Amino acid sequence: NYDKPPVEKPPVYKPPVEKPPVYKP
């Protein structure tokens, strides 16, 4: 028996961003 259906794509890891990345050269 299958516990869960086969995943089409792997889960995308997105870290929670508090603020947008600041570009500082």
Curated annotation (Swiss-Prot):
Region (4 X 5 AA tandem repeats of P-P-V-[EY]-K): 5-24
GO cellular component: extracellular region
Intervals holding Sequence repeats: 5-9, 10-14, 15-19, 20-24
Protein name (Swiss-Prot/TrEMBL): Repetitive proline-rich cell wall protein
Disulfide links within the chain: none
Pro residues bias: start-end ranges: 8-25
Organism in which the protein naturally occurs: Phaseolus vulgaris
Subcellular localization, as worded in the UniProt entry: Secreted, Cell wall
